[in-house]
Amino acid sequence: MERSASKALEVVVFKLNEGVSREQFLGTNDAVSDWARKQPGFISRELSYDAEGDRWIDVVWWESMEDAGAAAERAMSSDSCAPMFALIDMESTLMIHGTPVAEPVRAAA
């Protein structure tokens, strides 16, 4: 069954700058989450770590692609996001936006 493309998924994959510790990076996460909660169209955010590839994966759901794009632009000049961004190797960063095309699959009850 095809799904309405009303929501938007944002996935950002990145590495940290050399010498940045996991603890140092995670110390900036709450400020970014608090900032995201205040953005129009924000639904949820989850930060994960891929130990095998030494990469971070930031997954954010938005109400629309417009909300996702506008928030991404505002984040780049946000004082709340700047400390986290300063720790990220921006050349390693890949940001992808997409819209759902099928119903989500859930575990059986």
Which ranges hold each PLM region?
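Short acidic, gly/pro-rich beta-turn/loop elements at beta-sheet edges
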Residues: R22-Q24, I57, A68-A70, V105
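Short, flexible segments with low predicted structural confidence
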Residues: K7-A8, Q24, Q39-P40
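Short hydrophobic/aromatic beta-strand micro-patches
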Residues: V13-K15, V59-W61
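Short, surface-exposed ligand-recognition loops at beta-strand->loop->(often short) alpha-helix junctions
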Residues: K15-G27
